[in-house]
Amino acid sequence: MVAKKRNTLRSKASARNSQNFGPDVANNGILDESYDIESDPRAFLHQPKETKKEKLLNRQNTFLSNLKGKSTLSDGIGANFDGISKSSIRRRKRKLREELKPRMQDLLTSLEQEKDLRGIIENSSKDMNNDDDIDMDSKIRFVDTKEMNLKKIEPGSVRIKKNQPNIRNQKGAKALAANETARFNQVLTNQDFQKNPFGALREVIKLQKH
């Protein structure tokens, strides 16, 4: 009995493949061909995403950049303060504030100018030959503040003293009560009040304006 060949089909298939593809066919009928596959960004199962920390950092950077842009647009000083310590920035700002404050030398020069102006006004008033038709608006009047604060007191008026005892204190209330009783007794014994009480009261109220 003759044994059958089991590799006849394989040998036929390999021979057929070698005829079709030539010498590039490897053993076992597998082709060795190189293919250029383009890289697909969605080839991976899990796409790369920004983490929460990265998102927070990006937001902070954008916020700071916007603030810097606004500060440089609002005033050009902010652009010069980049890379400078906070203490030096404070010193520079303090120096700018000191420059804006008024100086004594400027005050002295203004006072000298005021004196010169007063002399010019006096000379001009003398040169006008005592003409009374000059408008008051064209003159500069120097008024003392003490004179403005003092009120004119009409003659014959009774001035009320402001340094009276305090009614909120027990001692002051007693003093005021004693003064009032003495005054009441004095008014009752007054002849003018006995003749015409309302007229006397009216006259006293008129006098008590200050």
Swiss-Prot record:
Protein's name according to its UniProt entry: Ribosome biogenesis protein SLX9
Biological role: Involved in ribosome biogenesis. Required for normal pre-rRNA processing in internal transcribed spacer 1 (ITS1). May be involved in the movements of the replication forks.
Subunit details: Interacts with the 35S, 23S and 20S pre-rRNAs and with the U3 snoRNA.
Native organism: Saccharomyces cerevisiae (strain YJM789)
Keyword set, alphabetical order: Nucleus, Ribosome biogenesis, rRNA processing
Induction: Transiently up-regulated during the initial 15 minutes of dough-fermentation.
Stored InterPro entries: Slx9-like (IPR028160)
Cellular location(s): Nucleus, Nucleolus
Biological processes, Gene Ontology terms: maturation of SSU-rRNA from tricistronic rRNA transcript (SSU-rRNA, 5.8S rRNA, LSU-rRNA)
Keyword Ribonucleoprotein appears in the UniProt entry: no
Domain of life where this protein originates: Eukaryota
Organism classification: Eukaryota, Fungi, Dikarya, Ascomycota, Saccharomycotina
GO CC aspect terms: 90S preribosome; nucleolus; preribosome, small subunit precursor
Region (Disordered): 1-33
Ranges of compositional bias, category Polar residues: 10-21
Xref: Pfam families: SLX9
Family under the similarity heading: Belongs to the SLX9 family.
